[in-house]
Amino acid sequence: MSNAMNFAFMREEPAPPNGRRVAIIGAGPSGLAAAGYLGCLGYQVEVYDKLPKPGGLMLFGIPGHRIPADRIQRGVFTLSRKFGVNFHNKTKICCSAPLHEEEGDHFSCDIRGLGELVEEHDAVIICSGAWKSRKLGIPGEQLKGVYSGLEFLFPIRAVKYATSNVSVPPVEGRTVVVIGAGHSAMDVAHSAKALGARRVVMVYRRTKKEAPAGSYEVDRLIDVGCEWLERRTPLRIVADETGQHVAALEMTDGTTGETEVLPADVIVTSIGEIPTPPFQKELGLENVRKGEVRWLHMTSIENVFVAGDVLT
């Protein structure tokens, strides 16, 4: 267990039970950290997550060379066996607002209401993360062969759990263009290369030194054969002769001011994710983010709190 992620970082043995129950919505980084913290203090913790295994994007989005799956699973095992944390997988929590679709929703076999959890627990913590990719807002993003970062990465890790309705993006022998320079974009480029892409080109609107993932990560990808184009601003995604599938990316060279057309079979827009809690209005999350609350991170519903990416 020495390589396990230490979610229960406060103590080696659990404290005596204090008789209080807490529900955590989401089993990603913030949810598991909250479960470990509360488990150490003697709370009975129930974790609800839509995916088939705990870990969130650590397990279902980030490639294994960055975060090995066995480290996550060992940490979860410790939470469950030693600290009594119960995990309710494949469970989607909703509110009165209509459900919106996100990556991984098809795994859910059970849908429960937030009100139920509030009634059954002394407190609820929403750690549902950021499961919606930002859009560029340029023409052609709806074409076949265009993916967001999550749409590209999620199936690669999820396919082992649901082969019938999840498929890995077909990139073998093709040209893949990745827009963005954060860690997700680096993960996309690395994964495309590992899946056998003939050519991987990274496109960024600033310079390598300004890449959010750091110039070191960019250099690592260049070393394995990826190409890097900087100071490029995407203008539109060009369709093929059928008008249905991507054929190229049209962009502006920020140095020369000229317009360029880069041929592509697959384009991945990886410019960040945004939180999509299904109860945003009901909980008054804008006020929570501004700090206009009675208790730190408590929503407009008594004893319902938020943590992690939901706060961003």
Describe each model-derived feature in a short phrase.
Residues 3-22, 113, 156-172:
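A short, basic/flexible loop-to-alpha-helix module at the beginning of a structural domain
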Residues 18-21, 90, 172-175, 231, ...:
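Phosphate-coordination loops involved in phosphoryl transfer and adenosine-cofactor binding
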Residues 142-172, 263-312:
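FAD-site-proximal beta/loop scaffold in flavoenzymes
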